[in-house]
Amino acid sequence: HELIHFQQKYDGGNLLAACIKEGAADFLAELISGRHINQHVHDFANPHEAELWAEFKQRMHGKDYTGWLYSNTPGRPNDLGYWMGYKITKAYYDKQPNKQAAVQDILNIKNFDRFLEASGYGK
């Protein structure tokens, strides 16, 4: 995960960008290793995906990461934003016919709104 961050050519910003940065690192680490590093977060979030997406959509352009990244929130696991970014990144990767190009795209995102749109996630 941390080695992926070294390869990423972008910084965080709003919640969407920060979550994609973290989730892309998780996704690419899984692609390399074959294992989730945050399985407990996936186990919690997958059954609540629709509700979490609705909540995330309302906040994704803000800079308040509370409840999503780098904080403790009662009733939910830490770092749900990693999971959300993972889901968006995986959706993008799965849609791309050229997987090598998709990895390069993921490492070099310039516009996070366009990346989300291209992923088709949440549609």
Regions found by a protein language model. Give the residues of each.
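A structural motif
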Residues: 1-3, 21, 58
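Active-site recognition of the HExxH zinc-binding catalytic motif
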Residues: 1-10, 26
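Amphipathic alpha-helical segments in well-ordered regions
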Residues: 2, 28, 87-91
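A generic structural signal for ordered alpha-helices
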Residues: 3-4, 34, 46-47, 63, ...
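General secondary-structure propensity
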Residues: 9-15, 71-72
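Post-HExxH zinc-binding segment in Zn-dependent metallohydrolases
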Residues: 12-55
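Pan-zinc metallopeptidase signature
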Residues: 57-123
